Amino acid sequence: TATTDSDTTAPVIAEFTAVTTPTSDFTPNYTFSSNEAGTITYGGSSSCNSNTSSAFNGFTSITLISLRDGTYDNCTITVTDNSSNVSNILTLTSFLIDTTAPTVAEVTAVTDPTNDSTPNYTFSSNEAGTITYGGSSSCTSDNSSVISGNSLIVINSLRDGSYDNCTVTVTDSAENVSNTLTLTSFNVDSTAARLVEVTSVTNPTNDSTPDYTFSSSEDGTITYGGSCSSNTTSATTDNNTISLNSLSDDTYSDCTITVTD
């Protein structure tokens, strides 16, 4: 009498390595285990599929066929052994495909020129992510994260000079890197103008609108203090001659000038 072995035990399958989420890879890998070899069937409403049709006894890695951006929360796998026993239904852990890079744009440029060595800068991003600073001008910031919307950063201390190649990029959680945003060029000038008297008012003088000459290390706006004033409001680099407004006969010992660059 012939004896026929019967296999009525279905394979048991389990997730081993889920799809990275989020991921910018639209053909991601997935690994599962099976205690029997067999044929893989793909299902679920999320329409995941693969060209891998056979499962090993042990671990099987599959590469999913090209997926569009979106959330995949109902991809399933079953394994059918040689005796047509069908395994449990394995639902892949939900994952997100995101192949779209953030878009960043300048909102508020650094004031130019500025005497602030740690100036503010505002830009927008349509995704949250991690900021990377670059460019040959060596601008950096302790602000490392960006929100979806406008983000204000404080640039780390800068020396006086021109900054015309500071860049920002944003990398989202799926590792998509944004366009490179180059900050509008700006100048940091934290050094005040230096003034020196060149030609004092003749003393005494019978001129009620006497001239006065001073030098400035920078262009700027003149501010008068004390009892003296003038219609000249701008200073140039080097020597400047001003005519004081009409003065009464008297002694003038409190006349001051400052220049704001």
What are these regions (language model features)?
Residues 3, 31-33, 63, 94-96, ...:
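Generic structural detector for well-ordered beta-strands
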Residues 1-11, 91-102, 182-193:
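Flexible, low-complexity linkers/stalks enriched in Thr/Pro that connect modular domains
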Residues 39-83, 89, 130-174, 180, ...:
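Extracellular beta-sheet repeat scaffolds used for adhesion and glycan interaction
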Residues 2-5, 12-25, 103-116, 138, ...:
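Short, solvent-exposed loop/edge segments of extracellular or virion-exposed proteins
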Residues 33-40, 124-131, 214-222:
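Short proline/glycine-enriched turn/loop motifs at strand-loop junctions of beta-rich domains
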Residues 26-30, 117-121, 208-212:
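Structural beta-strand segments of beta-rich domains
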